Amino acid sequence: MSASIGLNRRKFLKGAGMTALAGAVGTGAAGSALADGKDIPYRVNGKYDFDTVYDRVGSGSVKFDSQIAKYGDKVKIGMGIADTDFRTPAFIRDAMMERLEHENWGYLGAEAYVEFRETIAEWNHERYGLTVDPTTLQIATGVHPGLISSIRALSTPGSKILLMTPTYNGFYSDLRATQTLKNESEMIYENGAYTVDWDDLEARMTPDTQTMLLCNPQNPTGNVWSEEDLLRIGELCLKHQVVVLSDEIHMDLVRLGHKITPFASLPDKDIVNNSLSFRAITKTFSIPASKNAYWFSTNPVLEARVKKYHQAGINTLGVVANAAAYKHGAGWVDELLVYLDGNHRYVEDYIKENMPEVGYTKSQGTFLSWLHFNNIMEKSGAVEKAAAHKNMDQPRSASDYFEDWMVEKSGIQLNDGRRYGKGGERCMRMNIGCARSTLKVALDSIKGAVRSV
């Protein structure tokens, strides 16, 4: 695989310090690759294996290879990009391999789309009790294309898009693509948790704000919005004629003890009819390369407006991979949620015991941790650098400099919080969708960096 895309796996492993990682987590001898899937069982003692460190280096991965290209041998572990390091389940791999054995790649027929939509609807009903009409499901190559089509249909260029921040950084690229402007309502952060600033949110629902991008669960803060919160958001949007675009790509990844409320499941029909929902299971099974998502609305008028701007353009293997996940993945997801909940608890306990100066937002969902480095960022010199260079043509934020500093001091790449809008300037996002042994190495390394200032 590596040769076919111009990457040398062993060179990357050596150059990036990945052999040191292998030794640290006990998965291989120095100079050898981490587990690459050959002869490694998918189950251990009847359970799916999330503990084996799976080697992604040399596969063209943004999370690893792109960081190595940027930082060279300074980086040990990529903990920024939001895809998990777990091995793709066998039922997805086998379905794709079976299709690959048919050596023709003609156009996918309409019948396949019908069956695929029915599979998606069954997943929604079985896991969330939500009845979705399969004929209303619009297949897309990702959540972003669906959001961009919707913004173009519902907002005019130069108008504002309402965001509750810190929020998913990808939304800002959607705004650039649609020539719309950000309208950021910063959430309130108190006692390690974020809540909506209701007065500010409503004040921003001005006539030039026609749509709101809602993230549920919220990336990066991990909020899983309650039915009460969603109804209140929906009531305000209905009152001020703002359409809700609900990005629910992380909806399968809710922590134990919490429950997701899909926007389309709200008990107020008028609120639901003022919305579109956007989903995918590419985060759940770490298959974003399959380029597959869907959106829908219970309002045929909104659906028709957006469909004018929408193109499906999906590929056959994407349908095969996602259909296999929907049909066979429930048990795998159930075990994944238990493992991720353990990772969240591990991070919380570790920070409390070893790095109390690092602020921790207790996540209710996603496989992401949102960390506050206020004083540490100041001591690292990142704030001073940002201030000194603020008049540059392309100024960098303090968290941007701090990302570089963290790689230099610890070998761990985290995403800088400035990307996530107002309120994220002194924060970093850490992906914990990895083996717990990798997580321990990363936290130990971050602790060493924190202790150095």
Which role does the model predict for each range below?
Residues 1-20:
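N-terminal secretory signal peptides and thylakoid transit peptides that target proteins
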Residues 39-142, 149, 327-328, 453:
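N-terminal small-domain helix-loop-helix segment of the aminotransferase-like
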Residues 152-214:
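PLP-dependent aminotransferase-like
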Residues 178, 239-240, 410:
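Helix C-cap/helix->beta junction micro-motif
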Residues 187-258:
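Active-site phosphate-binding strand-loop segment of PLP-dependent enzymes
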Residues 340-348, 360-389, 424:
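Conserved glycine-rich beta-strand-loop-beta hairpin in the small C-terminal domain of fold type I
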